[in-house]
Amino acid sequence: MNDDSRPEAGRFIRPVDLDNEKRSTLGAKIGWSLEAFAWDWVYWNPMAALSLEAASNTVSRILKTIGPATSQHRSMIRNLRMAFPDWSEKQVEECAKGAWENLGRLAGEMPHLAKMKPYVRDSRIEVVGAERLDTIRASKKPVVFVTGHFANWEVMASAICNRPLDCQITYRAANNPYIDRRIAKARHAYGIQVLTPKGAGTRELMRALGRGQSIALLNDQKFNQGLAVPFFGHDAMTAPGPTRLAMKFKAPLLPISCKRLGPARYRVTFHEPLMPDADPDEEKAIYNTVLLINRFTEAVIREAPDQWFWMHNRWPKAAWAKAGVM
C-alpha cells in the first residue's frame, strides 16, 4: 500500500472510572505504581531486550510449565471436555498445554508487535482477503468486524488498521490504568489508532458507525446478559451487541480469523461478509445471526484448538454439571 493516510492518530477512549484519578485513593495509586513497576522490569523490558522469537519461546515455556498448576487450567480442561467429548484424556491435556504455550507466545510477542506490521516486505503476518478492506474503504460505508481470541488477536487489529482502514477497535481495559496506558501506547506503535474499551458502552460505537467508521469486536466470551446460543453443542451466553449494531446501521458483519504458523508468524484471514438475518421477527433474526457468528467461531477453533483462549469460563457451571465434566 502506498497510501500513507491514517485516521486520527492515538485516539484513546477510556472508561471514566479508570481515568478519574481524583476519585482514587492513595493506596490504590501506590498499588498501581508497584504493579506497573513489576510490569516494566519483570516482564516488558526483559522481553523487549530479547529477540522477537526468543521472547516468544521464553514466555511460552514458562506458561506451559506453570499454567497446568493454576485454577484456570481446571477450567480449561472442563471447557475442552465440553467441546470435544470424544477426546481422550491425553488429547485434552495436550491441547491444554498447547493453549498455555500459545498464550505465552502472545505475551512474549507483545513488546515486539511494532516489528510485526503486515503489508511490508518479509512481514511475519500473511493476510488473506485484504482486498475486502480496500472494497470497504472505497465504499465509504462501515462494517462490523467480528472475531475471537484466536492465536494472537492483537495482529488482527493491526491487519485492519495498517491497510489502512478507519476502524474503532474495542478491547477490555486493564484494571490498572497505568498498565492500561502502557498497553495503549504499544498498540498505537503498531498501528492501532482508535481504541474503545468495553466500559465506554455502545454509544461511542454507534457514533462511529453513524459517521461511516467501521468497528471491530471480539464476540467469543461469555456475556451474562446475552442470548443462550449453541456453541459446541451447548448453550452459551453470547453478546448480541455486534449483531444489533450491524442491523441498526444495515452494515455487514465481516468475520476475521488468525492462525499461528510458527513462532511470531501468523495468517490473518478476512472472510466473506455475513448479512444479518432477514427474518421479520427482529429477535429471531438477532438469534439466527448470533448463531452464525458462533458457528464461525467454532469452525475456526476446530482448525487449531490449541490456539484459542480456553481459560475463559465460556459455559456456566450448570452446563458443566449437565455435561458431566465437573
Where are these regions (language model features)?
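Catalytic core of membrane glycerolipid acyltransferases/transacylases, capturing the structured
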Residues: 105, 137-199, 224-229, 260
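Hydrophobic alpha-helical segments typical of transmembrane helices
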Residues: 42, 54, 76, 156, ...
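Short, flexible loop segments at the rims of nucleotide/cofactor-binding pockets, characterized by
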Residues: 120-125, 172, 191-197, 231-233, ...
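Active-site metal-coordination segments of metallo-dependent hydrolases
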Residues: 74-75, 176-177, 236-239
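Non-catalytic C-terminal accessory region of glycerolipid acyltransferases
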Residues: 2-18, 23, 28, 86, ...
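Membrane-anchoring hydrophobic helices of lipid-metabolizing enzymes
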Residues: 2-147, 181
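Short, composition-biased local secondary-structure segments
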Residues: 45-50, 152-157, 203-216
